[in-house]
A protein has these predicted regions:
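Conserved SAM-binding loop
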Residues: 330-393
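Short glycine/proline- and charge-enriched loop/turn segments
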Residues: 33-36, 90-96, 230-234, 352, ...
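Histidine-centered metal-chelating micro-motifs
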Residues: 162, 183-185, 207-210, 298-299
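Flavin-binding catalytic cores
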Residues: 237-271, 343
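Conserved mid-domain beta->alpha element of the FAD-binding
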Residues: 6-36, 155-156, 184, 247-249, ...
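Short helix-loop capping/hinge motifs at secondary-structure junctions, enriched
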Residues: 190-196, 232, 259, 284, ...
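Conserved N-terminal helical subregion
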Residues: 1-6, 23-25, 48-187, 232-250, ...
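Active-site substrate-recognition segment that forms the wall
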Residues: 198-234, 253
Length: 393
């Protein structure tokens, strides 16, 4: 296999998964990550359908199951804490509880994937790609912390706001499809005493209310908030610092009741606070020359699809497999990768568009009344989830 020097930008989910497979196939893999180390925090994410088989082939399926959230159900409350709805059949974050899906915290899944890669993979934390120049035989890369190196292939696995994608394909405004909202997440103590349980608080206005779920054997909880806004990220978030973003959330939630005031107090000291746009990435092509995209950087489905993580893991498997099948011929491999996966990625993006349209219609018809069926994922969800079968490479 030729073209074995591969640089991957991003060390969250798609990056470590791709690194695992490329290392297994004999590549010299380097992963560069802007953060100083594995990033803590993030929402609970779901591993479904063929992504479960990817985990099984990596030998980590049982381990991720040991880290699953293990929620027993969910309830909804009003501003006074009165229960409006309760179920032990499903949750808003993870869907049907009797499914084979694995709901796991983003940072837990990332840790498992990073560990699976072993010592053969080089990780460069606290750094990122400053520039790259493609030549006929290699890509010359310079890093923000200094120094330059040559690689045969560069893969952007650095998410919706991929700086690597911007260097090669142009600014994200060309590719970002705004879904009309922003999602915030942070960790708090489980002071509510939730026992593998999820609670949703809904409120009227331009916010989605709040959600709290106990995690890690009830030792802590994750808080979710949502803001309705069509403002592009460059305007709503722009150059705002994390402290500025927290002030934005506090201002939007100034009239919130139930436990939201206390949860917002915890937000101020939360080191893992994260606020970002709910968006999709639509690309006419996933590759240009010796550079290609994987996961959210190329085909993010948004949190509204419930499938971004799974599609990213499948994408990593397919990209590595097609490189192996092509003997390292990046031109042939990138074309085969996109042929193989684009239909699945687009179908999963459509899930999010359908879910948003359905929820918008329900909100319009419901008015200010609380949603008492907040976790219905719609017909055909699992048909799409399971519509792709992994190839053997």
């Amino acid at each position: 296999m030729r073209n074995t020097r591969v640089l991957i930008s991003g060390a969250s989910i798609a990056g470590p998964a791709l690194a695992y497979w490329l290392d297994r196939y004999g590549c010299q893999v380097t992963v560069v990550e802007r953060a100083a180390g594995p990033r803590p925090g993030g929402q609970a994410i779901d591993v479904r359908g063929p992504a479960l088989e990817v985990c099984a082939r990596m030998g980590v399926l049982e381990e991720i199951r040991t880290h699953r959230t293990g929620l027993r159900g969910m309830s909804m409350v009003d501003g006074d804490g009165k229960e409006l709805f309760s179920t032990t059949e499903r949750t808003a974050s993870g869907g049907q509880l009797d499914s084979p899906d694995v709901e796991i915290l983003r940072d837990d899944l990332s840790s498992v994937l990073l560990a699976a890669g072993g010592d053969g993979i080089e990780y460069l934390f606290n750094d990122s790609i400053a520039s790259l120049a493609q030549g006929p035989d290699e890509v010359a890369v310079t890093f923000h912390r200094g120094g330059s190196r040559a690689f045969d292939i560069v893969v952007a696995a650095d998410g919706v706001h991929s700086s690597t994608r911007a260097l090669v394909f142009g600014p994200e405004e060309k590719f970002l499809h705004h879904m009309g909202g922003y999602l915030g997440v942070w960790t708090v103590p489980n002071y509510l005493g939730l026992d593998r349980w999820e609670v949703i608080y809904q409120m009227p206005g331009d916010v989605w209310g709040g959600m709290v779920m106990s995690v890690r054997e009830n030792t802590e909880a994750r808080v979710y908030i949502g803001i309705d806004s069509d403002e592009p990220p460059a305007e709503l978030l722009g150059s705002r610092t994390v402290s500025d973003q927290k002030r934005l959330v506090a201002e939007r939630y100034r009239d919130a009741r139930w436990e939201m005031p206390r949860l917002l107090e915890y937000m101020w000291g939360a080191p893992d606070f994260h606020l970002d746009v709910a968006a999709q990435i639509h690309m006419d092509s996933w590759s240009r020359g010796r550079v290609t995209l994987v996961g959210d950087a190329g085909y993010c489905g948004s949190p509204m699809s419930g499938q971004s993580t799974s599609v990213a893991m499948v994408g990593a498997y397919v990209l590595a497999g097609e490189l192996k099948a092509a003997g390292g011929d990046h031109t042939a491999a990138f074309a085969a990768y996109e042929r193989e996966l684009r239909g699945y990625a687009v179908a999963n993006q459509q899930l999010a568009l359908d879910n948003k349209a359905r929820k918008d219609a329900e909100t319009t018809s419901r008015g200010q009344e609380p949603d008492t069926n907040p976790t219905d994922i719609g017909d055909g969800f699992y048909e799409v989830v399971n519509s792709y079968t992994l190839k053997d490479y």
